């Protein structure tokens, strides 16, 4: 997206241009496993800071959070520190966990066997065929999430963030003159 920075800046001069991206883990090696075909966490963090420096607002999606893999206090706190430093406007989080559709589940389980031997059996035992796969640490991590965002002035209510994203903001660099401000021919 940074290759389009000039376009984003021009759009942002006229109206709000918000860039959104996911952050799943602060651990680079884990990032390559969880999201093998995307930019590294470090590259995304640098992009967030570049966007900030150019006045482009950003929103982070905190997902997926995989039970027993990246659902740690250290990981969530590290991601939130990045968000604070990058001055993101909001962080969208629907809870600590993930969803698994049929079809995706089989692929996911193969990847668990490949990268985290033995974890597939735990998932099957605890979650069965459920679509929603919540972290057993959801309450603790969501409390950390909300508290940290609140203390840092980062939007963390999903409805508030979506309202912000959908609110049209026209930017008029000079404003509109009222009838009484028009120059007179005297």
Show the residue positions of the predicted features.
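Conserved AdoMet/S-adenosylmethionine-binding subsite of the radical SAM
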Residues: 1-126, 130-133
């Amino acid at each position: 997206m940074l290759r389009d920075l000039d376009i984003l800046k021009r759009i942002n001069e006229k109206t709000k241009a918000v860039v959104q991206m996911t952050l799943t883990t602060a651990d680079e090696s884990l990032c390559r496993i969880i999201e093998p075909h995307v930019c590294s966490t470090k590259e995304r963090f640098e992009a967030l800071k570049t966007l900030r420096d150019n006045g482009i607002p950003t929103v982070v999606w905190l997902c997926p959070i995989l039970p027993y893999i990246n659902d740690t206090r250290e990981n969530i706190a590290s991601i939130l520190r990045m968000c604070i430093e990058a001055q993101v406007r909001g962080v969208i989080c629907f809870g600590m966990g993930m969803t698994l559709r049929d079809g995706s589940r089989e692929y996911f389980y193969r990847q668990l066997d490949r990268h985290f031997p033995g974890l597939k059996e735990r998932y099957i035992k605890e979650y069965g065929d459920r679509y929603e796969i919540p972290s057993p640490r959801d309450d603790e991590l969501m409390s950390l999430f909300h508290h940290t965002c609140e203390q840092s002035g980062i939007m963390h209510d999903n409805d508030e963030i979506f309202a912000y994203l959908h609110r049209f903001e026209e930017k008029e660099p000079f404003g509109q003159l009222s009838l009484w401000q028009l120059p007179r021919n005297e």
